[in-house]
Amino acid sequence: MQKKEENKIPKIIHYCWFGGKPIPKDLQDCIDTWSILKGYQVMRWDESNCSFDENEFVRKTYAEKQLGFIGDYYRLKAVYEYGGIYLDTDVKVCKSFDPLLDYPAFLNFIFDCSVGSAIIGARKGNPLIKALLDMYDNTTFGTNRSGKVFEWRDGK
């Protein structure tokens, strides 16, 4: 039987910052609010610890300097491989995530109850996060005559 702590979302905050530029003050002010999360480790994902050779989607978006799309992939990869909570840099934390750590995963909702990607929490190896991550293996990036930015390899 697993210990209770092993069956929780770990106290790790992940965030992505690609492009090498300094973080603007307004975003740093948001990141600074994360300090209320006592006992949490913060992991930054950037050019120093990402390979950009994960799949065709990552290679192409990196080559075309589409940094936001790169973050879409690496937020999922970080949460899948380490577990923890991904936060966009414009997220202000007002209270602890501790009450959510017993769940297998959680996502934020935005506007009209659409699922957002600014906050993603999950245990290491979570199958939902894996399924979302695997979608990028079947996604190409680029525009075509229809104006699509993304396209599934089966043409949908």
Role assignments for model-derived ranges:
Residues M1-G71, L87-K156:
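Glycosyltransferase-associated regions of secretory-pathway enzymes
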Residues Y73-G84:
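Small-residue hinge/turn detector
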